[in-house]
Amino acid sequence: MLALPLLGAREPTTGPLTTHPWVTACKDRDDRDKPGPAFQVYRNTYYVGTCGVSAILVTSPEGHLLIDSGTEAGAEVVLANIRALGFDPKDIKLLLGSHEHSDHIGGLLTIQEITRAPIVTSFEGLNVIASGQATKDDPRYGTLEPMRSLPESSYTIEPSPILRYNEPKAQFLLDKFGVWPIPTPGYSPAAMSWTWRDCEGDECLTIIYAANLLPVSRDDYKFTDNPRYVHEFLASLQRIADAPCDILLTPLPSASKMRDTLRAGSLNASYAYRCDSYTRFQRSLLIDRLLQEDPEWMKKNFPQGIK
């Protein structure tokens, strides 16, 4: 698989160093199924994932929503973390995913069996979740672990356990929970980011769970052979860069420097890693990848460079 450095040079954080339980238990780029403690991100938003892979719980009196599940094994950690916070997984009314790979949504059907909550995803994501197989236009197609699949009858009849985010029922649920989708294809064709407002008294913050935006692939894949996909990738980066972003969360905690920020203090502090820094770095990796693949293609398609 062609890969790029995950984070590059670290940006220094400032603030008082603290001993956060998650920092003590977990390392950067830790094992994807290693249990880590749940913690409150802000008001009604909680981190309930493993040490290596994120899962986010957003709570409300009317029910909760969960974004990502980790692997099938990781889903058991997620469920245990939800219970450890005092919440009942059966009160989860909506399931969302960041991108259609087994390390992030491989346990989503396991959690759905317990919660009976619908999964809201993109059109492409529905096909992957239902079949358990990545699509051929995924840059990592052929290298990904398969996931559990659903029999066709279970998602073509009502009530369907999987909804496309632009369906009326899905839009009703998203509006009810105050969460909005941001399509972000790039790392995978069906990648989705999610944003919501969370309030502590009169202070409301915008939280973004931004999909992975690394330009990685199988060895024989070239982004420069797929110019339309490159433009979609760049548009995804711009959507995240332009979005209000008080707190950044990512499917891989290390991608948003979560451990560094927690070690220094709070995820909503002024020194926290946010969407502008995140997308600037990911864009630089994409540019490097395109130049590595075909410098002449870059000159022809982006004569002024990629801003």
Please tell me what each predicted stretch does.
Residues 11, 15-17, 21-27, 34-35, 64, 71-73, 153-154, 160-162, ...:
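Metallo-beta-lactamase
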Residues 24, 45-47, 70, 95-98, ...:
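Short, flexible loop segments at the rims of nucleotide/cofactor-binding pockets, characterized by
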Residues 31-85, 89, 193-215:
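Conserved beta-strand hairpin/beta-sheet module of binuclear metal-dependent hydrolase folds
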Residues 45, 73-76, 83-171, 278-281, ...:
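Active-site HxH/HxHxD metal-binding segment of metal-dependent hydrolases
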Residues 44, 58, 68, 99, ...:
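Divalent metal-coordination and catalytic microenvironments
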Residues 2-14:
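Bacterial Sec-dependent signal peptides at the C-terminal "C-region" and cleavage site
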Residues 274-307:
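C-terminal regulatory/interaction regions
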